[in-house]
Every structure is written in C-alpha cells, then in structure tokens.
Amino acid sequence: MRRLGPFHPRVHWAAPPSLSSGLHRLLFLRGTRIPSSTTLSPPRHDSLSLDGGTVNPPRVREPTGREAFGPSPASSDWLPARWRNGRGGRPRARLCSGWTAAEEARRNPTLGGLLGRQRLLLRMGGGRLGAPMERHGRASATSVSSAGEQAAGDPEGRRQEPLRRRASSASVPAVGASAEGTRRDRLGSYSGPTSVSRQRVESLRKKRPLFPWFGLDIGGTLVKLVYFEPKDITAEEEEEEVESLKSIRKYLTSNVAYGSTGIRDVHLELKDLTLCGRKGNLHFIRFPTHDMPAFIQMGRDKNFSSLHTVFCATGGGAYKFEQDFLTIGDLQLCKLDELDCLIKGILYIDSVGFNGRSQCYYFENPADSEKCQKLPFDLKNPYPLLLVNIGSGVSILAVYSKDNYKRVTGTSLGGGTFFGLCCLLTGCTTFEEALEMASRGDSTKVDKLVRDIYGGDYERFGLPGWAVASSFGNMMSKEKREAVSKEDLARATLITITNNIGSIARMCALNENINQVVFVGNFLRINTIAMRLLAYALDYWSKGQLKALFSEHEGYFGAVGALLELLKIP
C-alpha cells in the first residue's frame, strides 16, 4: 500500500472494496486528493465501525512490530477502562478493539476532521459511510433514527442537538410513518406560524417550574399557603399529567376544610389570574402552625417528592421545619426572607386587584357604628408608605420604593399576645372564639380611663375622658374583678394590644414623615373591631393627617411573595 500524503507520515489507510466509493466520496468532500494508485484492501480484525460500515483505522509501526491497536479483538483487557468502555453511553464510532473515534481523533487531527465530516453528513441525512446520499436533502429513515440514537447516547450528540433539529427540517418522513411519530421526530422543524407558536410554548415550558405551584409562609401561629390552580390545561397535558398531581389539585380545590383545622378562604380566591403565562385561580389556605407535621406527612402520602417540587417558604417556620421537610417528606425548602416576600406580595396583589374590585380600603367615620363605612382606596401612588405587619408579633417597615425599604421598629405585643392572654383569661381555644367574645364585652369595666382619674377630660394636654389611662387598671379592685365577665376581659385585651400597635405606628409615621399607613397581618382577619379602632386612633391623634389603610388579603402577602419567587416574577 502507498502512504497517503495528507495523513500522518506513519499512518496507512485501508478499506473494504464495498466501501471504497464511500471513502473516496468523503475524502473528496474534505478536499483530499487521492492518488489513482492508492490500494484499498479488505478490512482487518481491528477495524473502525461507523454504524454498519467498517474502515481500517490508522496503523502505527512500532519498533517491536506490534500492532498499535492491540493484539486481537478478544484480548483488549490491557487497554484503560475509559478506552474499552467508551465515554459513557453508546459511542458514535468505535474501534473494535475498544478505542473510540474521539480518542483517535485526538491522536490524529486529520482523521478527526474526517470523522467530524462523517457525523455532519449523518446528521444532514446523508446515510451511512459508503451509502449514496439521496437527492434534495432526503435521507432514509434508518439514517435519521441512527443519528437520533447517537444523539441520545453520546454527550457530543447532545451538544450538537440544535444542529440536528435544524438540519432535519428538510427531511421527509418514511413511507408508512404515523403523523404523530412524524410530528415528534420533527418537533421544531416546521417553518410556518405553527412552528413559531410551538417554539414559544416549548421555551415557556423550560422557563416555568413544574406544577404544582405553592407559596408558604410559616408563621409562629398560622401557616399561610397559596396554591395556583391552572385552568388552561390542554388535552395533551392532561394525558401526560401524573396521578399524584391530579390528586393534589383535586384535594386542594374540592375541599373548603382540611381536617379539623385547615381552612380554604374561598371568599379570597383570585380568579382568572395569569401567572407565568398560565391562566388559573389562586387559592388561599391557612392552618395552625402546630399542625405542620401533619401537613408534611400529607405531602409524603401524596408523593410530593416524585413531582420534583421545590417549596418556596418564608417565615420563621421555614428554618424551624426545614429538617422535617427533608427527612419526613423528602422535600427541599427554599428559604426566603420574610420582609422581602411581604413587600413583593402586597405590591403584586394590589396591582392585580381583587376580581375587579379594589384590594385596598379604609374606614369612614370609624367611631360611629351606624355611620361607619368601608370604602375602596386606590393605592396608585404607594410610595412612601408605612407597612405595619401584625402577626404573632409586630414589624413596622418604611417602604420608599420596590427595592428600598427598612425595618423601623417592632413590638412583641401582637396577635399572639392577644390570643394567648384570651386563652388564659377566658378559656377560649380558637382565635375566632376570642374575637367573638371580645365583640360582646365592655372594656371600660376592666380599664381605668382618664375620666376615672380626673373626673372628665384632661384639657391641658388634650386628653379626652374616654381615653385609656391604664389598661386593666380596674382589676386591682377585688370588687371589680368579681364584676367583670370573660367577654369584658377579652375586649379589654383586644383594646390593649390594638392601642399599643396604633401608638407605635403613629410615632413611626411622624418620624419618617409618611402619611399612608397600611396595616396587614392575620391579626386583622375578621377583626373589624381592631381595624376601626386603629383607623379612629390614627385619624384622631394625627388630627386627620394619617390615614389607616387595610387590605383584603391581609395575612397572605408573605406566601404570595414566596410564590412569586418560585416563578421569578418581579
């Protein structure tokens, strides 16, 4: 045989006669000149396999005369494991003695270029080495499927996947191929409007997290959960949807109560909402924090972990229960900052509204039960605002813009204090029961007022006689202790906590020079007494300069912010 000039000076080539035309064709495409006297001999045992055809690999003359690629195909154990087994998966081209084409391409750049050209021809539908290319870019079904198998099994094939899809757009399906099979094989190869639409859908799917979409706010007293229920599920999506996902959606949306303590606030449901390109309803669910282990167990029973779900959670419980989520439910928690989620949630919910109604509202004539009105408020210019979050405790934030805010102060006397004291003083067992008792009580029998001390108003300092001078001040008297009812004690407790929060909020607003004060948090849920008292106190003590604002979804903003973080919505 003659030595081919363009190749390595120590390399000879040989190929079987049946493949000589294919080899000549490849060398011609590469621009390699082949002398007419070049001999193509039958293959040896250590030949290069390219999906059905064989070409002898380069042979290196060693001083000992031993063949470069091993003594025989049956004895290749002396080769390194990574050469015997390839690079993982099914290699595109392999030497029968165990060497991959990629390894040889590194040793011989010219051979590497030849093999690269062969891969390109295979991807363009040119068939196998030695098989004539069909005209007009058409390829046999066997060639296309072979290229697809290579791409699936080889890391290099995955890197060249975009090239394969673009090139395959010119191919024609094999006779007898089903329409569905053709559509799947040629996904993304259409050139009309349908192709653009399909590509956009696929792009959005890659950017969106997998269902289900949850946001969690695990507080000290209550857990708030928001769940997005997609309403635009296609027939194809429904067919591919796993049973555990269907079970979760049905369980959450078909029930109003979950066990003895879980509640879905149906009146707060946001309908026809668009999130991350999907249309659906946003559900709001709450349950006591002490039931969190039962919630985690339910997630395990419903096989949440098989859905690759990441729970975005905020609140102190995100740290407290992180290990339980991992060990019991096999679920990963993404812990988020509580105040960041709160700001994101309130701004987003205010922007989407409340099913055509205003999210924000205030009270007109709060001190007069007959004339008091709840009126909508347009928070179109929200900045600056003072945000008072009343949960178990209280945090007060000054918000100057979406990304510029600070925590001004807070207090430990919050909703948890009210409920805890009511449990001690009245024997109630639920927050709702405590509020119901407070609505029937009279706090003046418990508190010592200004008029109890001065006999009327304290005009010098502008203190009206009805103002509280000492919370629970009358309870120092044995006679008065015996005269009060549990309802009176509950009412006095509510007034005490609310007055303290209102006083701190007013001082913060004056110091920060902010006129809009927004009160949120689950302490205000179904708590009209506290809201009216806050509204009246701010208006009275500021002489009309401060306005107390409230929101319909008062306790769920942290959970909404966690959901937005899951979807990466600003």
Swiss-Prot record:
Effect of residue 532 to W: In NBIA1; no effect on enzyme activity
Substitution effect: residue 219 to V: In NBIA1; loss of enzyme activity; no effect on its mitochondrial localization
Record PTM text: Synthesized as a 62-kDa precursor which is proteolytically processed by the mitochondrial-processing peptidase (MPP) via a 59-kDa intermediate to yield the mature mitochondrial 48-kDa subunit.
Compositional bias of kind Basic and acidic residues: 155-164
Biased composition (Basic residues): 84-93
Transit peptide location on this chain: 1-31
Region Disordered: start-end pairs: 34-94, 127-198
Tissue spec: Expressed in the brain (at protein level). Ubiquitous. Highly expressed in the testis. Expressed in the umbilical vein endothelial cells (HUVEC).
Motif residue range(s): Nucleolar localization signal: 82-94
Active site location: 338 (proton acceptor)
Disease named in the record: Neurodegeneration with brain iron accumulation 1: Autosomal recessive neurodegenerative disorder associated with iron accumulation in the brain, primarily in the basal ganglia. Clinical manifestations include progressive muscle spasticity, hyperreflexia, muscle rigidity, dystonia, dysarthria, and intellectual deterioration which progresses to severe dementia over several years. It is clinically classified into classic, atypical, and intermediate phenotypes. Classic forms present with onset in first decade, rapid progression, loss of independent ambulation within 15 years.
Family: Belongs to the type II pantothenate kinase family.
Protein's name according to its UniProt entry: Pantothenate kinase 2, mitochondrial
